[in-house]
Amino acid sequence: MENANQDTFANPFKFKSEWKNAFTDEEFIKVFASDILENYIINKRWYGGKASTLKYIEVVDHFKITSKKNTYYGVLLEVNFKEAFYQHYFMPLAFMTSDELDTSTIISPAKFGPIEGYLVDALHQEDFRKLLFDNIVQATENPELKLIFHKGMQFHDKEYKSSKFMGLEQSNTSIIFNDAFVLKIFRRIYVSTNPDYEISRFLTERMHFKSSPAYTGSINLALPEGN
């Protein structure tokens, strides 16, 4: 549901586990993939399966990434269609209480143990966007995260100042950092290195090409069956 206010939702989904342990709870994973996600994903602009009939969604992988204030998850989804094919999507996920929300775009109300709040796309939370920026600056590599942060030679900023979305969301989500850098988040995931990333990095670091935006950094998702 696009830009929906949290007050329009029905009662929250209730789970016994704490949010920090959500993806070790089989009940949460089952409800999240079916009852919660199916109604949400079909209305997103980046969802590429609108011409087909959704059969079911499966959580095939996940990782946890934390800031000083919050726990977030990166979730790899496999969307299966009745036409006998599937697509992979990446969703960064947050759970926020009402006073922590930076957005009115809600996935679903939820309750983990005694704590009520909302499941939201983590990219809508400034704390999460800052976390991505800081990890690129530090060029952090942590195999447990299944993420590889790379800082390019042309990236000189060391301090996060601001972030905002660029234009309408299409097949990807673009975020402007410090009014100077654009991070393009690809929602649909392919089991290979993204050609946009390869070309941009090659032109900047190998060819020193000046007529296109310089490559300044990247985030790669390391999957068991590919990149």
Residue ranges and their predicted role:
Residues 1, 49-66:
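C-terminal low-complexity, glycine/proline- and small-hydrophobic-enriched intrinsically disordered tails
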Residues 4-20, 54-57, 68-71, 157:
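Accessory nucleic-acid engagement/destabilization modules that flank
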Residues 10-54:
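Short Lys/Arg-enriched alpha/beta "domain-start" segment
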